Regions:
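Short glycine-enriched loop/turn motifs at secondary-structure junctions
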Residues: 4-5, 63-68, 98
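Short acidic/glycine-enriched loop/turn segments that link adjacent beta-strands
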Residues: 40-44, 65, 98-102
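Vicinal oxygen chelate
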Residues: 1-4, 88-121
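N-terminal beta-strand motif that seeds the catalytic metal site of vicinal oxygen chelate
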Residues: 1-22, 69-71
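Mid-chain, well-packed structural core segment of small domains
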Residues: 67-85
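Core segments of cupin and vicinal oxygen chelate
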Residues: 11-54
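A short linear hydrophobic-aromatic micro-motif
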Residues: 33-35, 57, 91-94
């Protein structure tokens, strides 16, 4: 037996907020939405995937945002994305550079923490 890699990241969201998730993850972050399997659609939530990047947002009736645990997402042209996020009213917190990477944190519209990373050239 061998675990090879992470298949996807699951984040929780409140019920009935799929359009808000589509706006943030789809429009702002540019991750395309993919259809959920028919047998899972009744649960609510929405999935976004781009190649090996898979973020699944699932409805949690007792939703509480993940404020410390977070996925780290590699971004191309992070400075441009930071500008867009700030224009849209999101608070972006810059962190110390580590491993020659520019790193910031932002909360999605539900309060889930995301780390956005771009390797410095």
């Amino acid at each position: 037996m061998q675990i090879k890699r992470i298949d996807h990241v699951q984040l929780a969201m409140p019920a009935g907020r799929e359009d808000v998730a589509r706006d943030f993850y789809g429009r702002l972050l540019g991750i395309p939405e993919v259809p959920k399997p028919p047998e899972m659609q009744r649960r609510g939530g929405v999935w976004f995937e781009n190649g090996d990047l898979k973020i699944h947002l699932g409805v949690d009736p007792d939703f509480k945002p993940a404020r410390k645990a977070h996925p780290g997402l590699l971004v191309q042209d992070l400075r441009a994305l930071v500008g867009i996020l700030r224009q849209e009213g999101f608070e972006v917190l810059e962190d110390a550079q580590a491993n020659d990477c520019y790193r910031v944190y932002v909360a999605d519209p539900f309060g889930n923490r995301l780390e956005l990373i771009e390797p410095e050239r």
